[in-house]
Amino acid sequence: DGLQLKSYWDGDETIARFTPHPEQSGGVPNHVYGGLIASLLDCHGTASAAAFACRAANGEMSSVTLPDRFVTASLKVDYLRPTPMGAELTIKGKLRRIDGRKIWLDLALSAQGEISARGEMLAIRYVE
């Protein structure tokens, strides 16, 4: 079923919310494991790249039938503090720059109002 993460606009940034379930702990009691945090940043980051690309082309996601797909070329994650299990997580994306097919993003994941992880992503528009 995947993460079923939904990303939305929040002004000039993007936002998603996710509440991890106990079976997603990765064996770390009461805390979200790093792999899930990286997956959430990755999933929200590539969706955000598509949204930023669409907005840069003077369109909104709602006006596009199938937005361009983006894939991760690079994802750097800094884990700042433990992330509690069961709390709603907020993932935010901010555009750093666009250069052709490449989009650089800054990402942040927070729980209970505190940032617990930051990410830097380079996403590339997928071309078949």
Predicted feature locations:
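Non-catalytic linker/capping segments at the edges of enzyme domains
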Residues: 1-29
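A generic structural signal for short beta-strands and their flanking turns/coil linkers
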Residues: 3, 12-14, 66, 71-75, ...
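Residues within alpha-helical segments
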Residues: 17, 46-50, 94, 120
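Hydrophobic residues in beta-strands and at strand termini
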Residues: 18-20, 79, 125
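A short mixed-secondary-structure module that forms the rim of ligand-binding clefts
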Residues: 19-45
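Hydrophobic beta-strand-centered segment that forms part of the acyl-chain substrate-binding groove
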Residues: 47-90
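HotDog/MaoC-like acyl-thioester-processing domains
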Residues: 81-128
